[in-house]
């Protein structure tokens, strides 16, 4: 099922074909460009990077924050997680969809919009109600006040997120609640379902309600929407657990591997029935660092385990905390991709068959680590991964991934995202009858 907004800021922002028809495929030749792109405006957690506490006391600053003091182009400068999706339209233009609008949005827009050629915002989609996803909405007045760039911006979110914004920022919902000089943003609100497709600017964006910690009384999960974009890229910015029913929904949109690593065969009985596409990339939260016991953010062990279950061709890590430099994350990713393991992993790989992925329960505790994994009298920094020594971090990263995933498998393509990185892919279905279901259609402007 899908949900189409009743209105849009521009007439070319929506396809007119009904969901389930073949009009979209037939119209493809009229589109000069079928390339969709996503630019990271932010890849840091809610505190962003660097931290004030680090840069104001350089002698005690962590490696990632210290690096930003001397390099204004440092990849360790990270805003709140979010980005911009660019979608080609039938008339040759591109629509711009803003994904989240957090506390650091204004600085990110000032930096990246001119460099990337962005200006108009055709729509904004929100993942959840936290400040790092919504507290930059007021800054969108620069686009709409006195119609500086556009008259209004359509905002798409779930009921829970809308209600939180209405309670905290009532003037964004109704100008009757405003005070002051009257410089207000102008929004067209769309309250969206969390279990149906959203069709925005001709692009299918499928929300998945994932857990982002458990709070409240009685205890219940805070929901953060993950977005499957074009059945090609899954954006998971804030997650602590993916319920099994959501894995079942994902399997309706993408070809997921079995536990032996094999993908589903083509459907029988029809030579024209299209296979589900293989996921091109997952953008995934590692805000928990190397933790195996996440509260509100998973860490690297869970992120790799989720990527394995998704069978994603590429994995981009995001939502970084301070403590470990971008280069150290990159060094681990490259070595992991080459199939390197810890010393324990080298021994384990010869003793048992390892499934491609495993399931786990929410709140499941990690296995007790071997004492051989730690130095004598380990420091708190070592157990969390915040350590000045890159080799200690890399070793511990291998160990935690191996412990949580239940064993060692050959490496995957994994890279740390950074602010300003752009990934792009050919729209799903360009091949005849979808025969490109498993081919790689994605690349970025920095990594190979």
Walk through the language-model features, giving the residues of each:
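Residue-level signal for inorganic ion chemistry
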Residues: 38, 165, 315
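Binuclear metal-ion centers of metallo-dependent hydrolases, dominated by the metallo-beta-lactamase
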Residues: 244-448
